[in-house]
């Protein structure tokens, strides 16, 4: 049982998502500690009174009741948690780690098992909603973990997200998130093909999307991506091609692991991988439309 109040939250990874969640936690009345591998990032946020900066994983792990990870890959999570001077060596028994990274479920289960041996809890809680959702606490979180760990951190989750779905044990959150992002990739490719065909047929693409959004053909790309980031040319979702390709690749690994035929998903994965020749990793992930529909 974890009976002590969890009032100090350490955020490891202060990029677009991490800094937004740190701000939400601060506004929610929590003591927020922050660490980022990039020099100066935590100190800059400390200067804005968002958090108290820490200079290493070890120091933030020792001082926090809950650790919230917002990192790019499973490899980075493993290094931060299991590596020398990491969370495993320094967090106190009773601490709970919340991993919001979109990560490999097998890696997640390995990390959670190692932490459990030290009496440290783990919940995989990947998020949807982008940097704006992180900054405004309107994200959705899909949670994998024990009922007791999730109950213990529910007050914290409530100040950083608007909706939470507990989908199963450790690893289930990351499995669900990968499938979500795979579908996002499929939707965006399908919508861009429809837009390309409409343009060729003399139909205004914006009118097409307006019509689709009133019918059964609507999807996340027509409802959000095209109106918010593509038609206006902003391409500033805060989510890069590199991250999307990584997520699609991990989702493809899930399909392989369970011998799923999935011809549509596999073709979508092939297109996302092939786009690397002309759309750079650092570009917004919505730039995939330039590969599919080079208008």
Locate each region found by the language model.
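Hydrophobic beta-strand scaffold residues
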Residues: 32, 53, 122-123, 164, ...
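NAD(P)+-binding Rossmann beta1-loop-alpha1 motif at the extreme N-terminus of oxidoreductases
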Residues: 2-70, 100, 131
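Rossmann-fold NAD(P) dinucleotide-binding segment
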Residues: 57-69, 74-119
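Rossmann-fold dinucleotide-binding core
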Residues: 9, 14, 102-182
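Interdomain hinge/lid region at the active-site interface
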Residues: 170, 174, 183, 219, ...
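Active-site-proximal catalytic alpha-helix in oxidoreductases
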Residues: 136-137, 141-144, 165, 169-201, ...
């Amino acid at each position: 049982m974890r009976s002590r109040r969890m009032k100090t939250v350490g955020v490891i990874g202060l990029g677009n998502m991490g800094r937004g969640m740190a701000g939400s936690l601060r506004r929610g009345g929590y003591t927020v500690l922050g660490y980022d591998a990039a020099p100066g990032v935590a100190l800059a946020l400390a200067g804005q009174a968002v958090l108290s900066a820490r200079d290493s994983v070890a120091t933030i792990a020792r001082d926090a009741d809950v650790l919230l990870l917002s990192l790019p890959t499973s490899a980075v999570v493993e290094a931060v948690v299991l590596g020398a001077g990491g969370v495993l060596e320094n967090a106190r028994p009773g601490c709970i780690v919340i991993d919001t990274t979109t990560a490999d479920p097998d890696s997640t289960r390995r990390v959670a098992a190692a932490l459990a041996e030290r009496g440290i809890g783990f919940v995989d809680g990947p998020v949807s909603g982008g940097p704006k959702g992180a900054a405004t606490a309107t994200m959705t979180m899909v949670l994998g973990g024990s009922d007791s760990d999730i109950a213990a951190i529910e007050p914290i989750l409530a100040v950083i997200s608007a909706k939470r779905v507990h989908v199963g044990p450790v690893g289930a959150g990351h499995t669900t998130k990968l499938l979500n992002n795979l579908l996002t990739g499929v939707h965006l490719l399908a919508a861009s093909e429809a837009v390309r065909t409409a343009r060729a047929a003399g139909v205004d693409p914006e009118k097409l999307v307006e019509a689709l959004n009133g019918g059964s053909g609507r999807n996340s790309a027509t409802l959000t991506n095209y109106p918010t980031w593509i038609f206006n040319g902003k391409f500033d979702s805060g989510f890069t091609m590199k991250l999307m390709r990584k997520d699609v690749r991990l989702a493809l690994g899930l399909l392989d692991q369970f011998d799923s035929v999935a011809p549509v998903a596999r073709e979508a994965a092939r297109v996302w991988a092939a786009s690397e020749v002309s759309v750079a990793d650092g570009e917004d992930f919505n730039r995939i439309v330039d590969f599919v529909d080079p208008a």
